[in-house]
């Protein structure tokens, strides 16, 4: 055991020389590249403990190499974390491509989405959500996805889903319904896409209210995208819709999306490409 301890101490207190290293006038080992010491003397009381007068020191070359290793490891851990957040946070892999970097810059509401991310801590503290409303294909879901991706790149958990999937999960899951909803509400930001497209059964409306009401009570922000108009939301058809819309409007600031239908444009481009391929 004593020999093993001595071997450990020997490794701890010995600097490993490289061929270009040299011994300086002070008797210490120096790096042959940066000319900085790779050893330092122990204080007298420490020298007595270790049974030798010197210990390894970090030269500039070693420091740079260590910092590069640490930075690479930090980047790897960050990428792993972001990958896991996106795996859990998105219900559709294509949402990973909904980023500000991939944006065509034509949506006038892009600035609002960017500022939401920039001021996320204030949005979170003050529980400020957004209601992206407007016509089909105007970029509501895309910009909501941009917000989700940008926050997850900052290692902030976000979940983006829709009520059709939520209702399917609730119907198929063996998990306690309240626990499922509580899990949704644990995310710092919840994004509900295509609100209003789910089936309007009594059961469905009750679960929609439960999710939105639970989110309201959690005190955490919510972003919703919908093709419904503000007039639809302010003039619900019945009491069941009224209490849902009331909760929603109390949590989310309405942001109107107008302009071109990007989906129609994309479909038109595909059609033109196909015609060109066929006629060439």
Question: Language-model features: where?
Answer:
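Pre-Walker A (pre-P-loop) alpha-helix and adjacent loop at the N terminus of AAA/AAA+ ATPase modules
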Residues: 88-130
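Short glycine-rich substrate-engagement loop in P-loop NTPases that contacts/grips substrate
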Residues: 108-117, 148-189, 199-206
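A short, basic N-terminal segment
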Residues: 1-104, 267-280
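Residue-level preference for the first positions of well-ordered beta-strands
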Residues: 127-131, 158, 189, 221
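Walker A/P-loop nucleotide-binding motif
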Residues: 124-144
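Walker B catalytic acidic pair
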Residues: 194-195
């Amino acid at each position: 055991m004593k020999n093993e301890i001595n071997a450990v101490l020997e490794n701890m207190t010995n600097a490993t020389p490289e061929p270009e290293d040299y011994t300086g006038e002070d008797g210490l080992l120096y790096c042959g590249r940066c000319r900085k010491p790779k050893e330092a003397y122990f204080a007298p009381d420490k020298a007595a403990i270790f049974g030798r007068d010197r210990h390894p020191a970090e030269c500039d070359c070693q420091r740079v190499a260590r910092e590069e290793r640490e930075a690479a490891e930090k980047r790897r851990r960050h990428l792993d974390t972001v990958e896991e957040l996106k795996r859990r946070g998105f219900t559709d892999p294509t949402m990973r491509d909904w980023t500000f970097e991939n944006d065509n810059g034509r949506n006038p509401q892009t600035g609002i989405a960017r500022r939401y991310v920039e001021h996320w801590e204030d949005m979170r503290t003050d529980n400020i959500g957004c209601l992206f409303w407007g016509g089909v294909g105007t970029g509501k879901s895309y910009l909501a996805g941009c917000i989700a991706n940008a926050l997850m790149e900052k290692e902030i958990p976000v979940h983006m889903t829709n009520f059709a999937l939520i209702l399917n999960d609730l119907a198929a899951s063996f998990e306690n319904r309240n626990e499922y909803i509580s899990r949704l509400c644990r995310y710092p930001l919840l994004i509900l896409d295509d609100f209003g497209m789910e089936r309007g059964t009594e059961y469905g409306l009750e679960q929609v209210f439960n999710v939105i009401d639970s989110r309201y009570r959690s005190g955490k922000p919510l972003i919703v995208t919908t093709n419904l108009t503000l007039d639809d939301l302010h003039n619900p058809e019945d009491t069941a819709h009224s209490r849902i819309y009331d909760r929603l409007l109390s949590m989310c600031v309405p942001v109107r999306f107008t302009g071109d239908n990007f989906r129609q444009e994309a479909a038109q481009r595909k059609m033109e490409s196909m015609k060109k391929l066929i006629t060439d």
